């Protein structure tokens, strides 16, 4: 049994507004009085759970990214580093994903692989896929 510790949980709420019209009519009268008011209530729209990847996974991903992008050894690549900030284009990102798949013996679905923008996101997806293989 494995335990996952999450680093953050956030919930975003949006307001839903609705306008309601009520008409009152007194018996025997032809005219109407209209009232209009807004009902507001918060409805949670999205619950986001972000679990930090293991430091060793982040380190491996960082090394692969540096290798695939031919970065210097002293180039800092941390969990929050975006591939685009390192000069990676879409082809570079495909090569990074291929390197990660080979290193971790996994296969990433194309739609998930396209959403990876940072080292942390790659590490989290890798851990998810490795866990699913077990």
Swiss-Prot record:
One Pfam family hit: PP-binding
GO CC term, one of those recorded: chloroplast
Any GO MF annotation of the entry: acyl carrier activity
Post-translational modification: 4'-phosphopantetheine is transferred from CoA to a specific serine of apo-ACP by acpS. This modification is essential for activity because fatty acids are bound in thioester linkage to the sulfhydryl of the prosthetic group.
Segment annotated as transit peptide: 1-51
Localization annotation: Plastid, Chloroplast
Alphabetically ordered keywords of this record: Chloroplast, Fatty acid biosynthesis, Fatty acid metabolism, Lipid biosynthesis, Lipid metabolism, Phosphopantetheine, Phosphoprotein, Plastid, Transit peptide
PROSITE patterns: CARRIER, PHOSPHOPANTETHEINE
Keyword Iron-sulfur set for record: no
Modified residues (O-(pantetheine 4'-phosphoryl)serine): 90
Tissues where this protein is expressed: Seed.
Domain Carrier: from-to ranges: 55-130
Something else known: In rape seeds ACP is coded by two multigene families. There are probably a total of 35 genes.
Family, similarity comment: Belongs to the acyl carrier protein (ACP) family.
HAMAP family: Acyl_carrier (MF_01217)
Function: Carrier of the growing fatty acid chain in fatty acid biosynthesis.
Name of protein: Acyl carrier protein, chloroplastic
UniProt organism field: Brassica napus (Rape)
Upper lineage: Eukaryota, Viridiplantae, Streptophyta, Embryophyta, Tracheophyta
């Amino acid at each position: 049994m494995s335990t996952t510790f999450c680093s953050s949980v956030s919930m975003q709420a949006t307001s839903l507004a609705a306008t309601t019209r009520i008409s009152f009519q007194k018996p025997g009268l032809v005219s109407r009085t209209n009232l209009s008011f807004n009902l507001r209530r918060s409805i949670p729209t999205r619950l986001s759970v972000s679990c930090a990847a293991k430091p060793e996974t982040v380190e491996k991903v960082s090394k692969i990214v540096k290798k695939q992008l031919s970065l210097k050894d002293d180039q800092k690549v941390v969990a929050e580093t975006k591939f685009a900030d390192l000069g990676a284009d879409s082809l570079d990102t495909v090569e990074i994903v291929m390197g990660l798949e080979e290193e971790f013996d996994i296969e990433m679905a194309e739609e998930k692989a396209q959403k990876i923008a940072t080292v942390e996101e790659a590490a989290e997806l890798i851990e998810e896929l490795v866990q699913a293989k077990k």
